[in-house]
Design a protein with these regions (language model features):
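Short, basic-rich loop-to-helix N-cap that marks the start of a DNA-contacting helix
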Residues: 47-60
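Short amphipathic recognition helices of helix-turn-helix/homeodomain-type DNA-binding modules
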Residues: 55, 62-93
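Alpha-helical residues within the helix-turn-helix
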Residues: 21, 32, 61
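Hydrophobic protein-protein interaction segments
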Residues: 101-106, 126-261, 266-280
């Protein structure tokens, strides 16, 4: 039985007790089903004992908890839940795909893209195609696989601005910490790919450490030979509560909004826009 640290309060006990009462189980009944002892369950609930990952998995199974609520139990005990791969294109998520199509369509003419936690592109809107077609060929657009790589590889500057350097630094910092916390090789691969981009500042770690990440940041792009500022806004699509950052499918919608209110992006819209990830 692992002992809980006296100076590290845990919310695991109250949460476990909540689920036990929800299922109308006594400590004895829960212990029997979880191959444990009544004393151990009691110690878990009053904070005298700290659960192992294996114990949490067993309790989640016995209590018939879904991924969202299992994540809550793990977070309450101080563990980062392991991500489970979920195929966004699985037929059982057709309802979610339809909702995302409506969302992306409503954002036209502003360029918007749906991606997974690694930045892999899942869907784009017509605004995205028309906008990026100003700087990239149709072939390059069709072959784009990762939001971050595409965004920075096809919008290079002769002399990268401080805004771009800071943006790259923040994205790298996010990927690096995700990689270290989750030990997910996909994040590590994504980090290495971004680090290899030509405009990455050599002091990206210190830059990112001095900046506070936000849901929106500025990016600068050359549109018709004129430097324009855009707000890059990312919105999370996931479960309510803290598990939105760990439960799957963890989706992100990124949209670019021009800082200049007079910049009309509808001029890039046309009926002939096409892309493998355009679903309407």
């Amino acid at each position: 039985m692992a002992n809980a640290s006296n100076d590290m309060p845990s919310n695991f006990g109250p949460l476990l007790k909540f689920w036990r009462n929800t299922h109308e189980l006594s400590q004895e009944a829960l212990a029997l089903s979880a191959d444990s002892s009544t004393r151990h369950i009691s110690c878990l609930e009053n904070g005298k004992s700290h659960p192992s990952r294996t114990m949490i998995d067993k309790l989640s199974e016995v209590l018939n908890l879904g991924e969202r609520d299992s994540c809550y139990l793990q977070l309450a005990a101080g563990y980062l839940p392991a991500a489970k791969f979920i195929d966004f294109h699985d037929p059982k998520y057709n309802w979610l795909k339809k909702a995302m199509i409506l969302t992306l369509k409503a954002m036209d003419p502003f360029p918007a893209a749906l991606m997974d936690r690694y930045g892999k592109l899942l869907m784009v809107n017509k605004g995205w195609i028309g906008f990026h077609r100003q700087v990239a060929s149709q072939a390059a657009l069709d072959q784009a696989q990762n939001h971050y790589e595409f965004l920075f590889a096809h919008h290079q500057e002769h002399t990268p601005s401080e805004v771009k350097k800071n943006t790259l630094a923040l994205i790298l910092m996010a990927m690096k910490q995700e990689s270290l916390l989750s030990q997910d090789s996909n994040f590590a691969d994504m980090f290495d790919a971004l680090l290899a981009l030509p405009d990455v500042p050599s002091d990206w770690e210190k830059r990112a450490a001095s900046l506070e990440p936000q849901a929106s940041f500025k990016v600068q792009m050359d549109i018709n030979h004129v430097q324009q500022n855009f707000y890059s806004v990312s919105q999370m699509v996931g479960a309510l509560g803290p598990t939105s950052f760990v439960s799957e499918p963890r989706l992100i919608i990124n949209t670019l909004y021009p800082e200049n209110p007079d910049l009309d992006l509808s001029q890039h819209m046309s009926d002939d826009l096409s892309h493998p990830l355009l679903a309407y």
